Amino acid sequence: PSTTPSASPSGTAEPGASSKPDATKAPAGNDKDDNTGGSTVKVKVGKKVTVNSSKYKVTSVSGTRAVQFTSGKKNAKNVVIPATVKISGKNYKVTSIANNAFKNNKKLKKVTIGVNVNKIGKAAFKGCKNLKSIIIKTKKLTAKKVGANAFKGINKKATFKVPKKKVKAYKKIVKAKGAAKTVKVKK
């Protein structure tokens, strides 16, 4: 194995934000669809990695590989929490959003939550007063899996776009988790 770390172009990195590769693993099999923002690090549970200016924490490396979204680019106005991210040539499902992930982010206006997210942490979007558009692609959220005050303090005119069969259930969840009664939940 080569000792030279391989790097993929990922735009401008924040100082100290990128993880140093401990060992470079060659991608297994035919990973020809390598995304340009992938990260190459020694992967273990609890490891924090940065992919495309967003930070993740590895939650599972065996069976279904999974990560938790911990934070996005500091002053981003539009954030997409993807279905998967590529780390060391392997795909990891993004299954959760950390507590306080975007708390008090005044710049954030739009968030897209990927199809594999099944948990949103406490106060994840609390105080994001300019957050007006939330697209939820996942069908896996329940009241127990969305933390307290997850949507408290978002824009009172915010619109949630959710899967067709989840409009009624998600309307109850977002309002129970702090969103104003004036927010709209639609398909």
Model-predicted regions and their roles:
Residues 19, 27-32, 72-75, 102, ...:
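Intrinsic disorder/low-complexity signature
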Residues 99-100, 121-124, 147-150:
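Consensus positions within tandem repeat domains that build extended binding/scaffold surfaces
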Residues 126, 148-153, 172-177:
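A structural signal for leucine-rich repeat
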Residues 1-44:
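Ser/Thr/Gly/Pro-rich low-complexity, disordered linker/stalk segments of secreted
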